[in-house]
């Protein structure tokens, strides 16, 4: 049985409240779970101690027997020191312009440098 540590939504409309639960990966998000290990109340301010309540011993136990936390909980557990902080891969290609645009920018920079040199020599 594949186990997940995930958030199960509760609360009213526009007033979310989450239970941190250990559940079978095939179970519905808000459905049957094995154990409740904490709560998360996003309506409270970030510095409030009641925003995240966690039974760290039980989380460590479930992680040791192979339960996989969701991405959101991995970030939270990393802040608490329960798991290693996930490594984010750098995006190397996406932010760079295409080759033609890079060539155009390089040519424009050369023209600007030549114009600046001419202006400096003319003074």
From Swiss-Prot:
Annotated Gene3D superfamilies: 3.30.1320.10
UniProt key word Nucleus: no
Keyword Ribosomal protein belongs to the record: yes
GO BP, one annotated term: translation
Listed PANTHER family: 30S RIBOSOMAL PROTEIN S16, SMALL RIBOSOMAL SUBUNIT PROTEIN BS16M
Family: Belongs to the bacterial ribosomal protein bS16 family.
Protein name per UniProt: Small ribosomal subunit protein bS16
Species name: Paramagnetospirillum magneticum (strain ATCC 700264 / AMB-1) (Magnetospirillum magneticum)
Lineage: Bacteria, Pseudomonadati, Pseudomonadota, Alphaproteobacteria, Rhodospirillales
